[in-house]
Amino acid sequence: MAEQFDHPAADSADAPRTLRPWVFNPLTGAVDLTRQPLAGEPEPDHFAILGLPQRILLDADAIEIAHRSLIRGLHPDRFHAQGPEAVARAQWHSSRVNDAWRGLKTLEQRAAYVLTLAGENADERYRPPPALLEQVMEANEAIDEAGHDPAARVQLLELLANFRAQREALAADLAKAAAAWDAAQAPADAAASAAARAPLRAVLGQARYVDNLIGRATAALSAPDPAYPAN
């Protein structure tokens, strides 16, 4: 079955097929709820499902517009006249669209996802540098002592401020690494793309460590201050 609806990547018959949402039949340009991968065509990833280019530095508004357009066009109410099977298929496609949208909402999510598509995991392959491990040990000591030592609490506050500053710097580093990876995709360059994944892994891995430290330090500091014991 086919149903037409508005989508920013499908407004024109000249729109590249790869930039049409996957639920659009590549031959007719119309929504096809029975769509299956064509011969030699891979299963769609999040980018393909939303009809967006496989890039990390995507415009947030473009992601939202693609999601809203697809969810509106795939709303089950539009397919009631075609029977329960069509409604069920629309619901299934809507679920995939929602999953894709949730998986691509932030720059960090998109960076992690392109690593996943390449069969990589930032957490598994990341090896923290000695300087970061030293900070982890220092933070662990301060966290352990913050509940009963006012001086350790002051130290932990300083460490937390430092971790937050590091996190901001890592966000900028990730944007640079993402730009390098995106540049390797047009035209597609497998070697350059593989090389560009290394900085993504490093930044994401370090960000996870710093996020963990921020969370633990914040939790420790939310406990009562030993300098002002409860009566």
Give residue spans per PLM region.
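C-terminal accessory/regulatory regions appended to core domains
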Residues: M1-N231
